[in-house]
Amino acid sequence: MRTGCSYCSIQTFYTNGKIAVESNLAEKLEAIPLDPDKNYHIGSGQSSDSLAIGNTNGVLDAQLDFARKNSNIILEFKTKSKNIKYLLNADVPPNIFVSWSMNPQLFIDHEEHGTASLEQRLAAARALADSGILVGFHFHPIVNYQGWKKDYRYLVQKVLAMFSPSEVGLVSLGTLTFIKPLIQKLRMSGIDSKVLQIPMDKAAGKKSYPKSTKKKIFQMVWNEFRPWHGKVFFYMCMEEREIWDAVFGNCYENNSEFETALFQHVSGKMSHAQ
């Protein structure tokens, strides 16, 4: 059975289709030159899935120990997995939180092969929140298809019903964005995917929805999250100032300002979560 997401640029990072697991991750983390006077938001799972392989080769042990030794970081585990047994049984430091990619089950079935179902992701997030671990949600990619409004409204309402704002560190919004090598690889793979059927414009050297479509889909999801406005940190992934201003009514001046705001919001909730 094929696993992985058809649309993900991660597949262009690797050439042989194999997963490699570090045997000395703890040593490599120890060697990272962190400034004790600075704060860091570190995302684990940027080029993989933080929880899919569990604690193979002690990779989760190493990351928890790294977070425990560095109180000036917040370490985010990004996942589409239901594999949370390790975290439920571990002594998880308060500066770690876990975030899930959220999409309607229809999209998961067609494009996110071999990943946990929507219900499994939500149940896993609920279990970690119940254990005092902060969670987050990435509505990325939000996809415009026939019936998308109904499906995403249901999804947002499900999240709102299952979690309180105090349990959620952040919510991100994003959509399909393709780099040229990924488009070529997807076309040559023979994968039964519909993501390349979307109308795309050039966007910062990549391919993505037209700006008018982005504004429409982001605004709809943002409005559905109205009960959490001002209570949860929201942001958009890789979007221009014009889109931020149109949807949120504001935009950070630079990445440093954005990272400072994210760190303050998330770390503030971490101090109350456990």
Residue ranges and their predicted role:
Residues M1-C5:
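Cysteine-centered iron-sulfur cluster-binding motifs in ferredoxin-type domains/subunits
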Residues S6-S101:
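Conserved Radical SAM active-site core
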Residues S48-L51, K82-K85, I96-T115, P141-Q146, ...:
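Conserved radical SAM core fold
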Residues G147-M162:
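Catalytic cores of alpha/beta
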Residues L160-Q274:
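Auxiliary Fe-S-binding modules of radical SAM enzymes
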